[in-house]
């Protein structure tokens, strides 16, 4: 047996996005601005839904959890990324890396299933309006929220355990801005085909299962909309689903490019850009999509502003 002098990795070094000093300044303030908008937009959405009784419906119950998931997924990556931009040593501990990968994967997988639950909610609201309150009971809504977290927990726990049980005995430099699974697998001192196969199967299963629920729901919704006689009725039904369709298209498109495509199909630079999109941009965009295209949210916000002006003016 060949004797190898190997060093066990106890921490990782993140290369980040750039070493150019001016680019660092621009990126820091840009990502800080985006992160603050993400926190403000999603916390604002959660608060508005919480305090306005007219928004205490299943649709906004799911939207509140979607905003929570967006805050958590962004917060698992962005603060550490901001700290590392100007850091001399962009290190992260072995356990810290595992925790970051676990939390981010958990909330991203949960978001996929939450979007599927929201699609089912829209299906019931448009296709079975008379049975809506009966079908979408409080118990069913809780199950449709707990289920995504449970399935995401199982999937992410599997990936994290499989990844961090691998031996890391060579380079500890991760050519990325956070602990993502593909850059980590490239550092392992063992064959990772099992990990990649499990990742492909589980990520594919999450995408296919949630995607099928969304697709079937919207096929039924489309068929129902086409049967509506009035143009106003069709327009109202369409705009009810527009925000959700936009959020689904953005998230699933980026996650498909990252996790389901073959690893050699794009360069590392494009991989980082796509990763930035779903770690930084999507959590910021979601509350904007759901508020700007949603009359009920805009009306609720307007009512709170007018009430505040009335109280101040008294």
Swiss-Prot record:
It is found in: Cell membrane. Residues 1-24, 119-143, 189-196, 259-268 are extracellular. Its main location: membrane. Residues 46-97, 165-167, 218-237, 290-314 are cytoplasmic. The chain crosses the membrane at residues 25-45, 98-118, 144-164, 168-188, 197-217, 238-258, 269-289. Keywords: Cell membrane, Disulfide bond, G-protein coupled receptor, Glycoprotein, Membrane, Receptor, Transducer, Transmembrane, Transmembrane helix. One of its GO terms (molecular function) is odorant binding. GO terms for cellular component: plasma membrane. Odorant receptor. Belongs to the G-protein coupled receptor 1 family. PANTHER family: OLFACTORY RECEPTOR. This is Olfactory receptor 5G3. It comes from Homo sapiens. The gene is OR5G3.
